[in-house]
């Protein structure tokens, strides 16, 4: 107590800060849905620390400065941390780092520099792994630092976490603490696949790691690309601590625990500053997000002497990078059309500098995200930029929302080609149905149209497609069949022979099959198997183009979403015009024959290995034409597995399931039947 009466205004501000910080902790740690940048959170926390330092009589046991994090969720079994999982204090500039070094040396009464260990500050989820006699017996999240959540079953699915420690030089009991991360590449792939499925995407790798680790179903966690890195020992029984922290990390490596490679032992604070500058320059080359560096006293004996304050160790500090999140205002929300027809809302922003880059546009990912985040025109929002990732809007600051903030609706027409835009129920992504006609989708449409399973135009690769579009030789998909030799030979590295070969391949592609043509159209959800199913059902293109959604849904393996996609595609006037033009230019196929009764009809086949007389595509096509079904994986529903040369794992699985195995000769006899 300092004997000074606390002004009412100050008391009110302290209470308000505690409320805000506790709320943000809940959103960050429990919901994995932060609504403010880390830099803003740090400012609030430091303001509260300063006020409590000035007025110590205001400090209460429940103040955020006296504890870590938030309450654990009730759905997981609680785990008590025998040694609290404390977070680190932060500094944001060289002055703060030098002050940290000075405090340590004064406390130890040392004038000369001593060793620190510098590590990247990983931007993931803290995790405690408990091993008994080398076996993983428990994994727990940090929670509030004292009580976490038991996530053992989920953690067992992370490939980088050993279920049994390597060697035999491990202690009777050891608690290994570290960080669970989702690498940038895995995060980008996960979000791409989630968007394709119409599922929820994550705003950043940290949220993805947290959400994945805290799934109630371990099977979901198992599908997420998570990694774990160890950085500290908590409990230890049956073995003495080594001399230094870097020796602990060597133990981890020996036991099979991953340790981040960019760790350096330095002599004194100058070495720490050099390490920081190095990581500022190289951070984007790292496979995962980092938001600063961690500096620890290397000597474990010195760590013990320095001890802890209530919230953090005295022997370590986090030196954070400049904020990669800033606040700005949404001036407008516009729509971009991607290569596959995905219509993405994009925020046009008041320009703001984030990590040294001026940001004036930011993605909102999809309409589910737009509405979940509730971003409106006129909102003050948080913008994040991490590495090469496109800047994104994290969320609005609701307290700053103007009364006239405008809610955006999904556009009914494509902003590029004015075709219908549809968003199937249950999917996150709205899509343009312009298909063949939409200029935004032109490149991908042509590449797909010419691909091996479609019209199979040999020599018309990605680079040549790009060149034809760039030179305006192809303006829509029918332009492939209107290319002239003189125009092709005028292009770089395209001689007469190359032009002749390409034109020959284009001419050859005109003779195709109805399933290949349907697949080539690039209708969303219509793969080559579905294309064969449609061709076998309707026999004629005209009948398919006139089919209702109800008729389409009656077909085996075609659900409501794919039925709607097919119907919408063929009912776009421009798509129908381009299909007719392709036929007028000579694209044709033999009449699909009705399936006659055969031994193949109604049976499911899987191919493994190479056939001598047929390609895989030809074999699958013949199966479908005969009324059978060709699939890519073996299951209890498979009737026959066709075994070619050098069969793969499907052969072994079929044997284990007792499924009929036939060779190429037997398959050809079935076809003749």
Curated annotation (Swiss-Prot):
Q: Does the keyword Manganese apply?
A: yes
Q: What class of enzyme is it?
A: ligase
- Which InterPro entries does the UniProt record give? BRCT_dom, BRCT_dom_sf, DisA/LigA_HHH, DNA_ligase, DNA_ligase_AS, DNA_ligase_CS, DNAligase_adenylation, DNAligase_N
Q: Which residues form the signal peptide?
A: none
GO CC, one annotated term: cytosol
BRCT domain residues are 595-673
The EC number of this protein is 6.5.1.2
Could you say which residues bind Zn(2+) here?
Answer: 414, 417, 432, 438
Which keywords label this protein?
DNA damage, DNA repair, DNA replication, Ligase, Magnesium, Manganese, Metal-binding, NAD, Zinc
Residues annotated to bind NAD(+): 38-42, 87-88, 119, 142, 179, 296, 320
- GO MF annotation, one: DNA ligase (NAD+) activity
Q: Is Metal-binding one of the keywords?
A: yes
The cofactor named in the record is:
Mg(2+); Mn(2+)
| Catalysed conversion reaction | NAD(+) + (deoxyribonucleotide)n-3'-hydroxyl + 5'-phospho-(deoxyribonucleotide)m = (deoxyribonucleotide)n+m + AMP + beta-nicotinamide D-nucleotide
Q: Can you tell which superkingdom this protein's organism belongs to? A: Bacteria
Q: Which GO terms describe its biological process?
A: DNA repair; DNA replication
Active site positions, chain numbering: 121
Question: What family does this chain come from, according to its entry?
Answer: Belongs to the NAD-dependent DNA ligase family. LigA subfamily.
Per the entry, what this protein does is: DNA ligase that catalyzes the formation of phosphodiester linkages between 5'-phosphoryl and 3'-hydroxyl groups in double-stranded DNA using NAD as a coenzyme and as the energy source for the reaction. It is essential for DNA replication and repair of damaged DNA.
Q: What is the protein name for this chain? A: DNA ligase
Q: Which organism is it from?
A: Coxiella burnetii (strain CbuK_Q154) (Coxiella burnetii (strain Q154))
Q: Which gene encodes it?
A: ligA
């Amino acid at each position: 107590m300092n004997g000074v009466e606390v002004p009412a205004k100050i008391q009110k501000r302290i209470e308000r800060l505690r409320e805000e910080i506790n709320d943000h902790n809940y959103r960050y740690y429990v919901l994995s849905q932060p609504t403010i940048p880390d830099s803003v959170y740090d400012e609030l926390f430091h303001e509260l620390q300063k006020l409590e330092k000035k007025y110590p009589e205001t400090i209460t046991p429940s103040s955020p400065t006296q504890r870590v994090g938030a309450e654990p969720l009730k759905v997981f079994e609680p785990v008590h941390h025998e040694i609290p999982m404390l977070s680190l204090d932060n500094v944001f500039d060289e002055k703060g780092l030098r002050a940290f070094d000075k405090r340590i040396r004064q406390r130890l009464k040392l004038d000369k520099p001593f060793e620190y260990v510098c590590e990247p500050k990983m931007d993931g989820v803290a995790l405690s792994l408990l091993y008994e006699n080398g076996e993983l017996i428990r994994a727990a999240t940090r929670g509030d630092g004292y009580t976490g959540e038991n996530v053992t079953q989920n953690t067992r699915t992370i490939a980088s976490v050993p279920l049994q420690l390597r060697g035999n030089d491990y202690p009777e009991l050891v608690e290994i603490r570290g960080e669970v991360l989702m690498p940038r590449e895995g995060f980008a792939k996960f979000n791409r696949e989630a968007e394709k499925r119409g599922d929820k995407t994550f705003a950043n790798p940290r949220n993805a790691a947290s959400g994945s680790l805290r799934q109630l179903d371990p099977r979901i966690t198992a599908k997420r690309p998570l990694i774990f890195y160890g950085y500290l020992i908590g409990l230890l029984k049956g073995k003495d601590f080594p001399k230094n922290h870097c020796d602990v990390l060597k133990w981890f490596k020996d036991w099979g625990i991953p340790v981040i490679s960019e760790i350096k032992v330095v002599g004194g604070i100058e070495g720490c500053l050099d390490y920081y500058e190095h990581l500022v320059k190289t951070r984007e080359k790292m496979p995962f997000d980092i938001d600063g560096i961690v500096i620890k006293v290397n000597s474990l004996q010195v760590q013990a002497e320095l001890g802890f304050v209530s919230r953090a160790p005295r022997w370590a500090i986090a030196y954070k990078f400049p904020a990669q999140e800033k606040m700005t205002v949404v001036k407008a929300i516009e729509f971009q059309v991607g290569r596959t027809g995905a219509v993405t809302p994009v925020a046009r922003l008041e320009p703001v500098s984030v990590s040294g880059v001026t940001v004036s546009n930011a993605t909102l990912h999809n309409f589910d995200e737009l509405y979940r985040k509730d971003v409106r025109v006129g909102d003050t929002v948080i913008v994040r930029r991490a590495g090469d990732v496109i800047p994104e809007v994290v969320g609005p600051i609701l307290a700053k929302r103007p009364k006239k903030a405008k809610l955006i609706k999904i556009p009914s027409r494509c902003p590029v080609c004015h075709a219908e835009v549809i968003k199937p129920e249950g999917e996150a992504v709205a899509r343009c149905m312009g298909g063949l006609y939409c200029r935004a989708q032109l490149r991908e449409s042509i590449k797909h149209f010419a691909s091996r399973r479609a019209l199979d135009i040999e020599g018309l690769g990605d680079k040549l497609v790009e060149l034809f579009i760039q030179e305006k030789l192809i303006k829509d998909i029918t332009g492939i069949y209107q290319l002239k030799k003189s125009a092709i030979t005028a292009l770089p590295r395209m001689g007469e022979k190359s032009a002749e070969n390409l034109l020959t391949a284009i001419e050859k592609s005109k003779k195709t099959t109805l399933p290949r043509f349907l697949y080539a159209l690039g209708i969303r959800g219509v793969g080559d198997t579905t294309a064969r199913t449609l061709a076998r059902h309707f026999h004629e293109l005209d009948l398919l183009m006139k089919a209702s959604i109800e008729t389409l849904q009656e077909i085996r393996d075609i659900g409501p979403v794919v039925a709607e996609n097919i119907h919408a595609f063929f009912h776009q006037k421009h798509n129908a015009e381009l299909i007719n033009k392709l036929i007028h230019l000579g694209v044709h196929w033999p009449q699909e024959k009705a399936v006659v009764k055969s031994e193949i009809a109604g049976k499911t086949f899987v191919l493994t290995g190479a056939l001598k007389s047929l390609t895989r595509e030809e074999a699958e096509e013949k199966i479908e034409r005969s009324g059978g079904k060709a699939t890519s994986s073996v299951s209890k529903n498979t009737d026959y597995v066709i075994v070619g040369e050098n069969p793969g794992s499907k052969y072994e699985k079929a044997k284990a399931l007792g499924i009929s195995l036939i060779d190429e000769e037997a398959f050809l006899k079935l076809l003749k039947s």
